[in-house]
Amino acid sequence: MRNNTKEPLIRIVKREGLKKRYIALLYAASVVIALGVGAILLFSLDANPGEYYKQMFTLGTINNRFAYLQYENYIKEFVPLLITSLALSLAFKMKFWNIGGEGQFLLGALAGATVAFMVPASTNQFVTIILMTLAGAVVGGLIGLLTSLLNVKFGTDETLFTLMLNYIALYIMTFFGETKAKWNIFLKTDSERPQFAKIPENGRMFKIQIGDFSLEISLIFTLLLVAFIFVYLTRTKHGYEIAVVGDSINTAKYSGMKVNKIICRTMFLSAALIGAAGALRVSSVESLSTSITNDVGWTGIIVAWLAKLNPIGIVIVTALITVLQCGCVTASVSANNVDSHFADLLQGIILFIIL
């Protein structure tokens, strides 16, 4: 009997096992295509694509006597995004979907600011920053631990739970930002309207002065963290357990692994790192804000997946995404018709092509 089923004209399938050079070529092609589409849109907005991309990729530093300020701002955005992306990759590698980066970051920042406002003014700056970072890590880690415990004990969906916690964290931050009261240590005391105060001097990011350029110590910490995560995932028993659980929970159980313990431990570490990133962020920008995350919780998901959860790849992708974000803000100054969020469009096109 003849089979009358028609074959589709076009079949789209996900190709597995591609060689590294083909993957690199795919990524490069994705960026080129995204820039090409962006160029067409820039033309339609009466902007010069060549000049716009020049300003974007150089961060507006050419013939700029204040170029060091652009590099300082780049590092301010690069550090929290890189830490968050690395942290999310830990949970994602285990196929535990931590979508709560925004909330963990916000509450980590709030915890860090609490330490900054409460420690004596005489406390050493370096010690204060360490205490702030630890406080952010503990608060973030406890949120992650709560999420994982509810998942392993009651089967709570971690995606929905962490997503809802984002909004709870935002409302908590908003509450402290809008509640004028004597007990609220986060607000300016001399302002009629509620306004977040600058954190004390000893809680502000420690910097190494190199000429006019100020290098934030958080960058060094972050690069060390990259090395730690790489070794942790590829050279330790814990990293092996994460990979096995991610491949198959049943296989992990049959091999005698304590799956629940692995999930809780990894989720605690993931959320703790994001909380620490929040504390470092508030130390860097020197004030709390409901928008202090700059959407790193969401962008970090994109970065982690574009990098295929590889720590080294995450560094490269984070560097590119941060160039797009900071560069588009700089380029939009000279191209008035182009919004600074043009970077989001380019990110979306790249992600669409690769995934």
For the regions a language model picked out, list residue spans one by one.
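Single transmembrane alpha-helix segments in multi-pass membrane proteins
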Residues: I40-A47, N64-V119, T133, A137-T156, ...
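Short, non-helical or kinked segments that cap or interrupt transmembrane helices
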Residues: D46-E51, F92-A109, V152-F161, R265, ...
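Transmembrane helix-bundle core of multi-pass membrane transporters
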Residues: N166-R235, F342
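Transmembrane alpha-helical segments in multi-pass inner-membrane proteins
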Residues: F268-G348
